[in-house]
Amino acid sequence: MRKTFFTVIFLSAIFFVKAQNNTLLQADFWKSNPTLETVKSEISKGNSPSEQNGGFHDPVTMAINNRISNDVIKFLIEQEGNVVHKKTHHSRSYLQWAAAAGNLEIVKLLIDKGSDVHYKDSYGTPVIAYAASAG
C-alpha cells in the first residue's frame, strides 16, 4: 500500500512538472494575446496543444477564456486530442466556455462540428445556463 501511494505521488509530480513546462498551459502566455504564428511556433517547439493542466484546462479553454483571436481558437480545436466533446475543467465542454465568453462564431463552429447543446457539466449545468451565469 505504501509503495503504491508513493508511486502515485511520484507520477503525479512528474505530470505536474511536465504540464508546467508546456508554454501553452501558462496563463502569462495567453495574457500576451499570442498570434496564430506564435502558437504554431510554440507547438513546433514541442508544446502540446491538447495537454491539460492540473485543473483540466487545456490550450483551447485558455484561448477561449482569454478571448484570443478566433483563428487561434479554430486552429487549436483542429489539433489532435482536441475534439468538440472533450471534457475540461468541471467536465465542461468547449461549447460551454465559448458560450460563456459570448463568442458566437466559435459557438456556431462547435455546434456545426457536433457539439452537444444539451450537455451538462459535472455540476449538472447545461450550456445555456452556464453561459447565462457567466454574464
Where are the model-predicted features located?
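Bacterial Sec-dependent N-terminal signal peptides
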Residues: M1-L25
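Ankyrin-repeat boundary/"N-cap" motif
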Residues: N21-W30, E51-I64, H85-W97, Y119-Y130
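Ankyrin-repeat intra-repeat helix-capping/turn positions
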Residues: P34, R67-I68, G102, G135
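Ankyrin-repeat helical core positions
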Residues: W30-K31, I43-S44, I64-N65, I77-E78, ...
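Conserved ankyrin/ankyrin-like repeat signature
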Residues: T38, I68-V72, E105-I106
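Ankyrin repeat domain, specifically the short helix-to-loop turn at the C-terminus of the second helix
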Residues: K40-S48, K74-V83, K108-D116
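Sec-dependent signal peptide cleavage junction
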Residues: K18-S44
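N-terminal adaptor/linker regions at the entrance to substrate-recognition repeat cores
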Residues: N103-G114, K120-G124, A132
